[in-house]
């Protein structure tokens, strides 16, 4: 491990210290390493041909005009990406789905875009994790 020195303005340093405290880091170096790893992992998932894993989460209105069947159709169209799906009934109208995906990150992003773009889908979020060798 090597030691490096960086210069931060006061506001950014205060934000880093606040983040470090909220997340329970023992020191700034641990926080900066995690932030950098996250940025590098996100960058790696943008490269075409990168294989990895992802978690897609979203909320949708299950009774909204054929929405559930459209989502299922999209899932079947991209069946090779699906590892597992968790379905949770939030309340009478809304459902939360969490899909674990694996495959080419470009294909995963395309699938996520297809689901999130459906009318009635809210709070869509894709978290990508490149496969580590």
Swiss-Prot record:
It comes from the Bacteria. Pfam families: NikR_C (PF08753), RHH_1 (PF01402). Its cofactor is Ni(2+). Ni(2+) binds at residues 76, 87, 89, 95. GO terms for biological process: response to nickel cation. Keywords: DNA-binding, Metal-binding, Nickel, Repressor, Transcription, Transcription regulation. NCBIfam families: nikR, PRK02967.1, PRK04460.1. Belongs to the transcriptional regulatory CopG/NikR family. HAMAP family: NikR. Transcriptional repressor of the nikABCDE operon. Is active in the presence of excessive concentrations of intracellular nickel. This is Nickel-responsive regulator. It comes from Salmonella arizonae (strain ATCC BAA-731 / CDC346-86 / RSK2980).
């Amino acid at each position: 491990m090597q030691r490096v020195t960086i210069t931060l303005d006061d506001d950014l340093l205060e934000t880093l210290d606040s983040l470090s405290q909220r997340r329970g880091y023992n020191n700034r170096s641990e926080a900066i390493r995690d932030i950098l790893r996250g940025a590098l992992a996100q960058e790696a998932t943008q490269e075409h041909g990168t294989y990895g894993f992802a978690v897609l989460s979203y909320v949708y209105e299950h009774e909204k005009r054929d929405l559930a069947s459209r989502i299922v159709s999209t899932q079947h169209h991209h069946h090779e990406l699906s590892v597992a799906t968790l379905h949770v009934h939030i309340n009478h109208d809304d459902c939360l789905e969490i899909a674990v995906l694996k495959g080419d990150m470009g294909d995963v992003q395309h699938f996520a875009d297809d689901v999130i773009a459906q009318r009635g889908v809210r709070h869509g979020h894709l978290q990508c994790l490149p496969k580590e060798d």
